[in-house]
C-alpha cells in the first residue's frame, strides 16, 4: 500500500508537470518546479505517514488513538510549513482549515491557527510597483505620509496607514503582487493532489475545499467587489448604531488597491483591552451575535471572515459608547431564500429541542441519516445537550473536551457531510466556529440572550417570508399576530432572565421563599 502511494504521488508529479508545461499553464519564473515539488513532497510524506504509522495497530485501541493523534500533529505541522513556504493561496486555505474548530481534529486546527499571524509581507518596492501600475502615480504624489510597516498583513494583501494630500487619514489595502497570477495555478495543483490522495484513501472527502476556493478566491482578489460589499452591509445594518464600517474612497481604489477610512481599536477577542478601556465584554458579545443573526437569518448576506483581526472594538471618549468595527469585506456568502428558510427553521427547532423538526430540516439541508452529527456540528454541543435543549445549560469543560475528541473520531462522517450539504453551508460553518472562538476567548459562550436574539431573527425572517407568499389578507394578519405574540413571549422570558440575575430579582425570590416557608 505504501509503495502504491509513492507510485501514485510520483505519477501525479510527472503528470502535473507535463500537463502544466505542455499547456503553458505555468510560468516557471513565478511558479517553478521547487514550488510544485514542495507541495507534492509534503503530500507524499503525509500520506506515507498515515499509511505506515497505523498499519499494524488495532483500530480503536488506546495505542491507535495515541498514534493517530501524533500523526495528525506531524501532518498538521508539515502542512503549516508548506503553507508558509508557498504563501498566497496556500496560507488562505490553511487559515480556512484552522478556523474549522469542532469539525477537524484539534491537532490540525490548533497548529494551523498560527497562520493568521504568519502571513507574508510585500516589500516597499513591491508595494510601490502595485500602486504605480494601478493608480498611475508614485506614493509621494498621492500621500503626505505613508507608513512602511503595515498595520496588518494577510495571505492576499497587507494594509498601510497613510495621509492623503488633503489631510484625510486612510487605510490603504494593497494586494501582494504575485497572488493574482499564482492563485488559479495553486488551486489546480491542490485539486490534482487531493484527487491522488482520494485514490489512496477513498474516505478522504476534501474536494469541497478546492471547490470553495475556486468560487471565492476570485471574489476576494477583486477589491472593488470588497468595497461594494462594505457599502452594502453598512446600508443593510444602518439601524445598529454600535456598528462602524469604514467608508470607501472610490476615486483611489482599483481591483488591487483599496482606500478606506482609517479606523482603529482593540481586537474583539482581547478581553484585557476591553477591561482596560471600560468596555462591557457581555455587551460586545451580545451585539456581535445580533449583527450575525441579522445578516444570516434576516438578510441572507453574511460576512464570512470574522476572525479577531477583522472585528475591532473601541469606546468613544465623548459618548462612552462601545463600537464594533467590521473590516475586510472580501468574503460574503449570499444565501438563497429556500436555504435561509430551512436554516431558520432548523435553528428554531434546535433551540426548542424539537427533534422531529431537527431531523426534517437537517435532511432538507443535505445531512441525510447523519442529522444528529450535523446538529452537533452546527451547535458545537453534544447530542445529549441538543436533545435536552441547547439553551438549557452552558457548555461545560467536559462537554467541550468530548466534542473536540469526537471531531477526530468522526472525521470520515464529517467530511462526508461537508461534501453533501449545500455549498452555502460551508462558509456558515466556518463563520459559526470563528464566532464561537471569540465567545470562548471572552468567556461569554452560548448565553441565553444569544439564543433569544437568534430566535427573534428567525421568527421575523420566517414571518416575512410567509407574508410574502400569502395572497389572503386574513392569512397575513394571522401571521403578523402570531409573530407579535412569539416576539412578546421572548421579551417576557428575557425580562424573567434579567430579573433572575438582578439584585431586585434575587430579593423578590428570597421574599417569596420566606413567605412560602412562613405559611
Curated annotation (Swiss-Prot):
Keyword annotations from UniProtKB, A to Z: ATP-binding, Kinase, Mitochondrion, Nucleotide-binding, Serine/threonine-protein kinase, Transferase, Transit peptide
Subcellular location, principal: mitochondrion
Gene3D superfamilies for the chain: Transferase(Phosphotransferase) domain 1
Family annotation (InterPro entries): ABC1_dom, ADCK1_dom, Kinase-like_dom_sf, Mito_struct-func_regulator, Prot_kinase_dom
GO MF: ATP binding; protein serine/threonine kinase activity
Any one GO biological process: mitochondrion organization
Keyword Magnesium (UniProt): no
Residue ranges constituting the Protein kinase domain according to the UniProt record: 145-481
GO terms under cellular component: mitochondrial inner membrane
Cell compartment(s), UniProt: Mitochondrion
SUPFAM superfamilies membership: Protein kinase-like (PK-like)
Binding site for ATP: 151-159, 173
Residues the record marks as active site: 305
EC number: 2.7.-.-
PANTHER family linked to this entry: AARF DOMAIN-CONTAINING PROTEIN KINASE 1, ABC1 FAMILY PROTEIN
Family stated for the protein in its record: Belongs to the protein kinase superfamily. ADCK protein kinase family.
Purpose: Appears to be essential for maintaining mitochondrial cristae formation and mitochondrial function by acting via YME1L1 in a kinase-independent manner to regulate essential mitochondrial structural proteins OPA1 and IMMT. The action of this enzyme is not yet clear. It is not known if it has protein kinase activity and what type of substrate it would phosphorylate (Ser, Thr or Tyr).
Protein name in the entry: AarF domain-containing protein kinase 1
Species per Swiss-Prot/TrEMBL record: Gallus gallus
Gene: ADCK1
Amino acid at each position: 500500500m505504501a509503495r502504491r502511494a509513492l507510485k501514485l504521488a510520483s505519477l501525479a508529479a510527472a503528470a502535473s508537470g507535463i500537463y502544466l508545461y505542455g499547456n503553458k499553464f505555468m510560468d516557471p519564473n513565478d511558479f517553478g518546479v521547487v514550488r510544485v515539488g514542495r507541495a507534492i513532497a509534503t503530500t507524499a510524506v503525509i500520506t506515507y505517514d498515515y499509511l505506515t504509522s497505523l498499519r499494524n495497530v488495532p483500530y480503536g485501541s488506546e495505542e491507535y488513538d495515541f498514534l493517530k493523534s501524533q500523526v495528525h500533529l506531524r501532518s498538521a505541522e508539515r502542512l503549516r510549513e508548506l503553507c508558509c513556504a508557498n504563501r498566497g493561496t496556500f496560507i488562505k486555505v490553511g487559515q480556512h482549515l484552522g478556523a474549522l474548530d469542532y469539525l477537524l481534529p484539534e491537532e490540525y486546527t490548533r497548529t494551523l491557527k498560527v497562520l493568521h499571524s504568519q502571513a507574508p509581507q510585500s516589500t516597499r518596492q513591491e508595494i510601490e510597483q502595485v500602486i504605480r501600475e494601478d493608480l498611475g502615480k508614485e506614493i509621494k504624489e498621492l500621500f503626505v505620509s505613508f507608513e512602511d510597516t503595515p498595520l496588518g498583513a494577510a495571505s492576499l494583501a497587507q494594509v498601510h496607514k497613510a495621509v492623503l494630500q488633503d489631510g484625510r487619514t486612510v487605510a490603504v489595502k494593497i494586494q501582494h503582487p504575485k497572488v493574482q497570477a499564482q492563485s488559479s495555478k495553486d488551486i489546480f495543483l491542490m485539486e490534482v493532489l487531493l484527487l491522488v490522495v482520494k485514490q489512496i484513501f477513498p474516505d478522504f472527502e476534501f474536494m469541497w475545499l478546492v471547490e470553495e476556493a475556486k468560487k471565492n478566491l476570485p471574489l476576494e482578489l477583486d477589491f472593488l467587489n470588497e468595497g461594494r460589499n462594505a457599502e452594502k452591509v453598512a446600508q443593510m445594518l444602518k439601524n445598529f448604531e454600535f456598528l462602524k464600517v469604514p467608508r470607501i474612497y472610490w476615486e483611489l481604489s482599483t481591483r488591487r488597491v483599496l482606500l478606506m477610512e482609517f479606523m482603529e481599536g482593540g481586537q474583539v477577542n482581547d478581553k484585557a483591552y476591553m477591561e482596560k478601556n471600560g468596555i462591557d465584554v457581555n455587551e460586545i458579545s451580545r451585539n456581535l451575535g445580533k449583527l450575525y443573526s441579522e445578516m444570516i437569518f434576516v438578510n441572507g448576506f453574511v460576512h464570512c471572515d470574522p476572525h479577531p483581526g477583522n472585528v475591532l472594538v473601541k469606546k468613544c471618549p465623548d459618548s462612552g459608547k462601545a463600537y464594533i468595527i467590521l473590516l475586510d469585506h472580501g468574503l460574503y456568502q449570499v444565501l438563497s431564500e429556500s436555504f435561509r428558510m430551512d436554516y431558520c427553521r432548523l435553528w428554531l427547532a434546535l433551540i426548542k429541542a424539537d427533534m422531529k423538526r431537527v431531523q426534517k430540516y437537517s435532511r432538507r439541508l443535505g445531512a441525510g441519516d447523519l442529522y444528529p452529527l450535523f446538529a452537533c456540528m452546527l451547535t458545537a454541543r453534544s447530542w445529549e445537550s441538543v436533545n435536552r435543549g441547547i439553551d438549557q445549560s452552558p457548555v461545560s469543560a467536559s462537554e467541550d473536551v468530548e466534542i473536540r475528541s469526537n471531531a477526530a473520531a468522526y472525521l470520515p462522517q464529517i467530511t462526508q457531510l461537508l461534501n453533501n450539504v449545500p455549498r452555502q453551508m460551508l462558509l456558515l460553518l466556518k463563520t459559526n466556529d470563528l464566532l464561537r472562538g471569540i465567545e470562548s476567548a471572552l468567556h461569554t459562550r452560548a448565553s441565553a440572550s444569544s439564543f433569544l436574539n437568534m430566535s427573534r431573527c428567525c421568527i421575523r425572517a420566517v414571518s416575512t417570508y410567509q407574508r410574502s407568499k400569502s395572497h389572503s389578507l386574513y392569512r397575513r394578519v394571522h401571521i403578523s399576530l402570531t409573530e407579535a405574540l412569539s416576539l412578546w413571549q421572548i421579551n417576557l422570558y428575557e425580562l424573567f432572565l434579567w430579573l433572575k440575575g438582578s439584585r431586585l430579582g434575587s430579593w423578590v425570590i428570597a421574599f417569596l421563599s420566606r413567605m412560602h416557608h412562613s405559611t
